[in-house]
Regions:
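Long, highly charged low-complexity segments enriched in Glu/Asp and Lys/Arg with interspersed Ser/Thr
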Residues: 202-226
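Short, low-complexity cationic-aromatic patches
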Residues: 86-91, 167, 171
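Short interface patches used for recognition in eukaryotic signaling and trafficking proteins
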Residues: 50-52, 76-83, 97-101, 114-116, ...
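Alpha-helical oligomerization interface recognition
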Residues: 43-79, 128-132
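Post-BTB helical module
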Residues: 101-194
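N-terminal BTB/POZ boundary and linker segment
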Residues: 2-59, 90, 94-112, 225-232, ...
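Long amphipathic alpha-helical assembly cores
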Residues: 80-85, 180-211
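Interdomain boundary/hinge elements
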Residues: 73-84, 144-148, 242-243
């Protein structure tokens, strides 16, 4: 109990003084991420930045094949402590909260930026799927201009470029295909200088530009934003994006 209070106060102080930035939480209770010792359930410790997080071996091993391997030393499930080097304590806490059955994390764009790379690294399929579903839903809201989700053209294009990058880096096929479809109508100048496009490997860059060129040739129209419905029908005949 004392350890939990100390961790909470320390985090609140750091956040208030600008020493620490973390994704937005819904309320103060969600900021408690110290995973204190529980004599009935704790049987493994994860050490990050010389801080100890007390967790359940079974939960970690069921969620992640990577954790399963780390906790099995020479095929024997006897590892009592594992260290995650070069990881952010705050980011690991948020990630672990996403896979803990006793926690609920309401995802948003900021938290996904943190959680998605870790979920991919540790191969946590359930969390990867949740992140992809959230991003696809957000795309649907943005395209439909749902209140609270509207974005300016440039902001919208950058979000689609981010989704294309995430789909590429984290093997999210549905997200990749949808983001590519949405970027095709826009001119290269809209996104070529964004950090997300610059981080893309050559293959998706080529696919994006080639798909746009094919669409332009089929419709005989150079657009920036969207092709007309008639042009879309002509351009989509027999056309399928490969991942």
């Amino acid at each position: 109990m004392q350890r939990t209070k100390f961790c909470t106060l320390t985090r609140l102080f750091n956040m208030a003084t600008g020493l620490e930035t973390v994704p937005k939480m819904e309320n103060e209770s969600e900021m408690i991420g110290c995973f204190p010792y529980d004599e009935e359930t704790t049987d493994v410790v994860i050490r990050v930045d010389n801080k100890r997080l007390h967790l359940s071996r079974g939960t970690l091993m069921q969620a992640s094949p990577v954790f399963r391997k780390m906790l099995s030393s020479n095929g024997k499930e006897n590892q009592a402590e594992i260290t995650l080097p070069e990881k952010s304590y705050e980011e690991v806490i948020l990630f672990l909260r996403c896979i803990s059955p006793r926690e609920f994390v309401k995802l948003d764009e900021e938290s996904i930026d943190v959680v998605l790379p870790l979920a991919h690294e540790y191969k946590v399929k359930a969390t990867l799927q949740k992140c992809e579903d959230w991003l696809l839903t957000e795309i649907k809201f943005i395209v439909g201009e749902v209140t609270g989700h509207t974005k300016g053209t440039q902001e919208k294009v950058e979000f689609f470029a981010k989704c294309l990058l995430y789909g590429t880096k984290h093997d999210l096929e549905t997200l990749y295909v949808r983001a590519l479809e949405l970027l095709v109508p826009y001119k290269l100048s809209r996104y070529q200088h964004t950090k997300f496009y610059k981080l893309l490997p050559d293959k998706p860059k080529s696919q994006l530009l080639e798909t746009r060129m094919v669409k332009i040739e089929k419709t005989n129209s150079i657009v920036d934003g969207h092709f007309s419905e008639e042009e879309e029908e002509i351009g989509e005949e027999g056309e399928e994006i490969e991942y």
